[in-house]
UniProtKB/Swiss-Prot annotation:
Residues 19-236 are annotated as: Disordered. The modification Phosphoserine is found at residue 482. Involved in the regulation of both adhesion and cell morphology and cancer progression. Functions as an anti-adhesive molecule that maintains an open filtration pathway between neighboring foot processes in the podocyte by charge repulsion. Acts as a pro-adhesive molecule, enhancing the adherence of cells to immobilized ligands, increasing the rate of migration and cell-cell contacts in an integrin-dependent manner. Induces the formation of apical actin-dependent microvilli. Residues 61-91, 107-126, 196-208 have a biased composition (Low complexity). It comes from Mus musculus (Mouse). The keyword Membrane applies. One of its GO terms (biological process) is leukocyte migration. This is Podocalyxin. Monomer; when associated with the membrane raft. Oligomer; when integrated in the apical membrane. Found in a complex with EZR, PODXL and NHERF2. Associates with the actin cytoskeleton through complex formation with EZR and NHERF2. Interacts (via the C-terminal PDZ-binding motif DTHL) with NHERF1 (via the PDZ domains); interaction is not detected in glomerular epithelium cells, take place early in the secretory pathway and is necessary for its apical membrane sorting. The keyword Ion transport does not apply. It is found in: Apical cell membrane; Cell projection, Microvillus; Membrane raft; Cell projection, Lamellipodium. Residues 426-503 are cytoplasmic.
């Protein structure tokens, strides 16, 4: 680096006023305005840095350092912050910078950031400027040491997500400042990220800042970084090498534990394509052979005298056995409508098979389903079905005549009662007419005997002997069981008593 450039930068640092930081009784959440760095160049720009939490730090370049880039990045939702330390053998000069916390009352989003080149002029990267950052040309930054605490450096960066970068930034390259992940107490000093400029580059009013890609190196090839420890309670930051060792040990322990669990437990079969089960289909019957299993008491096991079903046995024997099992499960099995699938598994070291499942699928036509559901329309209505159609046919008509059944029952009962009354009346009328006829004949006979017969032509016929009644007297003078006797048994005296009344 030319000495003139170093001297000019040193003069700028000596002439720049120290930053003002608010200490004392203020809390860690108060916003601190950043100091302004003024330069003796053509244009002087003072901006406010509104990124990060309230942190005040003092950097002193009193020790020479090697040309090894020192990289520190903070965990932020945006890009990491890189702070390169260029080579410098000059001493003296203090640079004080302060980073203020993002104002909570701001409503504008940081869409773009305005950066200042090495000469002090500010160039906009485009868009609305929500945040601004001022860079001062410094050439005497050495190894970072905190004046108040020379042994420990306070930082809240998380090295788990810290990428090690090889900075190749030019004087016009912007540096992204990301918000810190924890707030520091007021009074403690934390190193701030300040870019350095190499060489004196003339700047113009409308200089365009160009981004240069940074090359990311793997975590294993990290450069010599200074161990950083945090004094914040509950947060400890380890160096990159220690983090790598801890991660490696953690991964190793996890792998050993996983291997130990697998070795002590049941052997796990490596995942791979499963072997498809052979399926034989003949007509409406299917035979599905699954992998061999051990005999189980809950399974139906069939010992076979011939070759097993899952082996290359004749299809006729398989079909016969499958058909027999399917018809046994469903007596009304119809090959035209039903499909039977038999799932079996051969038994290890035995000529037997285990019947695992018998599935019968019934293929019904829509017409058959409609006829079955038609009879249960009331149940469908209760289940939430409002309509059912098959072509032009709809749900069955509902009979809303609630009095039809009681009316029919009443009519039948009344008809039965009328028939019963008519039968009783017929029987009574027949008996009455018979009594009247007998009484009339008796009166006529008595009139004829007394001679007062009106009809002279009336002839009284002799009754046959079988119709005459006469008491039979036994030898002992007692009446017998029957008093009807034939006419021949009458005595002559009885016959003389009869007179011929015929004129």
């Amino acid at each position: 680096m030319p000495p003139t450039t170093a001297l000019s930068a040193l003069l700028l640092l000596l002439l720049s006023p120290a930053s003002h930081s608010h200490n004392g009784n203020e809390t860690s959440t108060s916003a601190i305005k950043s100091s302004t760095v003024q330069s003796h160049q053509s244009a002087t720009t003072s901006t406010e840095v509104t990124t990060g939490h309230p942190v005040a730090s003092t950097l002193a370049s009193t020790q020479p350092s090697n040309p090894t880039p020192f990289t520190t990045s903070t965990q932020s939702p945006s890009m990491p912050t890189s702070t390169p330390n260029p080579t410098s053998n000059q001493s003296g000069g203090n640079l004080t910078s302060s980073v203020s916390e993002v104002d909570k009352t701001k409503t504008s989003s940081p869409s773009s950031t305005a950066f200042t080149s090495s000469s002090g002029q500010t160039a906009s990267s485009g868009g609305k400027s929500g945040d601004s950052f001022t860079t001062a040309p410094t050439t005497t930054l050495g190894l970072i040491n905190v004046s108040s605490q020379p042994t420990d450096l306070n930082t809240t960066s998380k090295l788990l997500s810290t990428p090690t970068t090889d900075n190749t930034t030019s004087p016009q390259q912007p540096v992204d400042s990301s918000p810190s992940t924890a707030s520091h107490p007021v009074g403690q000093h934390t190193p701030a990220a300040v870019p350095s400029s190499s060489g004196s580059t003339p700047s113009t009013d409308n200089s365009t800042l160009t981004w240069k890609p940074t090359t990311h190196k793997p975590l294993g090839t990290s450069e010599a970084t200074q161990p950083l420890t945090s004094q914040t309670p509950g947060i400890t930051t380890l160096p990159v090498s220690t983090l790598q060792q801890s991660m490696a040990s953690t991964v190793g322990t996890t792998t050993e534990e996983f291997t130990h669990l697998i070795s002590n437990g049941t052997p796990v079969a490596p995942p791979g394509p499963s072997t498809p089960s052979p399926i034989w289909a003949f007509g409406n019957y299917q035979l599905n052979c699954e992998p061999p299993i051990r005999p189980d008491e809950e399974l139906l096991i069939l010992n076979l005298t011939r070759a097993s079903l899952c082996e290359r046995s004749p299809l006729d024997e398989k079909e016969k056995l499958v058909e027999l099992l399917c018809h046994s499960v469903k007596a009304s099995f119809k090959p035209a409508e039903d499909l039977c699938t038999l799932h079996v598994a051969p038994i290890l070291d035995n000529q037997a098979v285990a019947v695992k499942r018998i599935i019968i699928e019934t293929k019904l036509s829509p017409k058959a389903v409609y006829e079955l559901l038609k009879d249960r329309w009331d149940d469908l209505t209760e289940a939430g079905v409002s309509d059912m159609k098959l072509g032009k046919e709809g749900p069955p008509e509902v009979n809303e005549d609630r009095f039809s059944l009681p009316l029919i029952i009443t009519i039948v009962c009344m008809a039965s009662f009328l028939l019963l009354v008519a039968a009783l009346y017929g029987c009574c009328h027949q008996r009455i007419s018979q009594r009247k006829d007998q009484q009339r004949l008796t009166e006529e006979l008595q009139t004829v005997e007394n001679g007062y017969h009106d009809n002279p032509t009336l002839e009284v016929m002799e009754t046959p002997s079988e119709m005459q009644e006469k008491k039979v007297v036994n030898l002992n003078g007692e009446l017998g069981d029957s008093w009807i006797v034939p006419l021949d048994n009458l005595t002559k005296d009885d016959l003389d008593e009869e007179e011929d009344t015929h004129l």
